[in-house]
Amino acid sequence: MRSGELEEKGTDIWKLFREAQQNILYLNKQRIMAKEELDRVKREKISLLDRIEQLERTKLINTRKDKFSISAELLLRIDAMVLTSLIGSKEASEFRRLIMDSNVSIADYFSEIMHKQDTELLVELRHFSGKSRKSGYHVIHVCTEMAPVVSVGSLALYVTGLSRALQRKGHLVEVILPKYASLNLNEVHGLREVDAEFHSYFNGQLHGNRIWTGVVYGIGVTFIEPLYYSSFFSRENIYGYSNDFERFSYFSRASLDYIVKAGKQPDVLHIHNWETSIVGPLFWDVFVNQGLEGTRIMLTCQSLESQCVEQPEKLALCGLDPHGLHRSDRLQDNHKSHLVNVLKAGVVYSNKVIIMSSMQTKGQIINATIHGLEPTLTIHKDKLVVAPPGFDSSAWDPSVDKFLPQNYSADNMKGKSACKVSLQQHLGLQEQASIILFVFMGSGQTPGLNTAMEYFEEELKDENTRFLNKYDEALAHLVLAGSDIMLCPSFDDTVLQVPLKAMRYGAMPILLNSTDRKSGHFVDRDLEGSKFSGYVKDNFTNIPLSQAIDELKNNPSKWDKKIVDAMTKDFSWDAECCDIHISAYAAIKNL
C-alpha cells in the first residue's frame, strides 16, 4: 500500500475515532440532560403536590376544620371556662360528655362560631346540650414527648400515633405536656394562653403556672409552664439533668392539680416511662377522691432500662409520704434498698402496664435480668400487656407517596422498578432494575455507627456501595421504595420503624445479626406474642442475607408472593397496637 493511501487510511481512522468520541460525549450529555429533566419533573411533582396540600389545608381552615380539631379546641375552651370560673366542674363534665357522643354532630354545629368569646360560646353550648350517650373512652396522656412538638425517642411517635388512631375509632384523647423552651410549635394550631393562673403544690407550698392550649393533628394539647420554677423547662435539652426527678415530679403533680381544677373526669390517665410514673402513687394517695373516683391509671413503658432511683425524702416534694412508700411492696428499689425507684412506682400503682415491644413476649420481658424489675413484674404479671408499636400509614404508603417518581401497590408493582432505577440514578449506581439492591438504614444516634459505616465503605472500596450520613425525608422514602432488601439491626425498632416500613414498601427486612436470628427460635410456651411478632418470625427471622439473595435470583415467584403478602398486612397504629390498648382500657374500667 502506498504511503499516501496509508496516510489517508490513518486520517479516516482518526476521524472515526473523533466521531465516536463526539457521539459518546453527545450521549453522555443527553443522559445528563435526561437525568436533569427527570429530577426537574420529580421536583415539580413534589412542589405541585405540596401546593395542592397547602391549598387543601387553606380551604379546610377557611371553610371548616375537621371534626377532631373542632372537638379538641372546644374541650380546651371548656377548660378555660372552668379556670376562669365561668362554669363549674359539674357542668363542664356534662359538656365533655356531649362532645364525646359520636352520634351528635357537634363539630358541624360549632365550626362557624369557634371565634366567639367564651361567654358567647357558653350560651351556644348550653343551648345545644341535651341528652347524649357516651360512646368511647376519655383518655388523658400525661407525658413528656409528642411528635412533632417535642421528639427525642419512640415515646413521641407513640403518643401521637396512638392518640390519632384512638380518635379515629371514636375515643376522646387529650395530651398534657411541659411547655419546654425548645417546642416545635409549627403544627400547634390555635395556640393560646388561658387568661387565668392556676396553682399546684410543690416543696411545701402552692406555685403559679401559666396554661397554654392548642390542637395538634386534631388532638387537644395543654402545655403547663411553671412560673416560680421557670428554669425547669427553659433548657436546651429535654432530659439528662441532675434534677430531672424534681422537674418531672413537679410536672406530674401540676398535671393532676390541673385536671382537678379544670373539672376533668377522664376514664383513663395514661402515664409514660419513669418521668410521669409518680402520677400513680399521687393519684391513689392524694387525688382519687377529688372527683376522679371513676378514673383508672395506665402506664406505658417504652423501655425498662431507665428507671430513676432517688432518695426517699424527695417524694415529699410533690406531696407524697416517703416513710409510707419506702417499702418493698411499693417504691423501694429491689437492689438498692435505701433508695426508691420511680418506674417501680408506676408499675405498682397502675391498673395496667403496657410494655412496647415488637418481638418480645411477656415471659421474656419478665425474666430479663438487665432491668432489675423482675421481682416486681412477676408479682404484677397479671396487669402486664405487651403491644407492638405501629407506624403512620398515611405518611408511609407507596400507593400515594408524593416523594416517589411512580407510585405502586401490592396490586400493581410496576412502579417499584421505576423507583429502584431512580434511586440508582440518585446514588450514581449502575441503572438496572434487575440488579439486587439492599440497604442498611440506621440511626445516627447509635454510638459509633457513622464511624463504623465509613470504615466499612473505605475497606470495601466498591463502586456499588454508598454511605449517606445525614437524613433526608424524600430520600428515605425513595430508599424504601427502591430497595429489595432492608438490613435491620433489630426487628424491635421503635424509633425508625424500618422493618414495618420495609414490608409496607415491598422490601424484605433481614436481620444483620445471626444471634438475633437464633433468638427467633425461642418460643414462650406460656404466653403468646403479638400477631406482628408471629408473622415476622414465620416469614423473615430465620432468613440470612445470602438466602434472601438466592431466593430473589432463583425463585422470584416465591419472593414476589412473600413480598406482596407483607405489603397487604396492616401493622399501622390503627391495627393491633390500638386494639390492644382499647382492650386494656376496657379491662381497667371494669375493675
Segments (PLM) and residue ranges:
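Catalytic cores of nucleotide-sugar-dependent glycosyltransferases that transfer UDP/GDP/TDP-activated
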Residues: 1-591
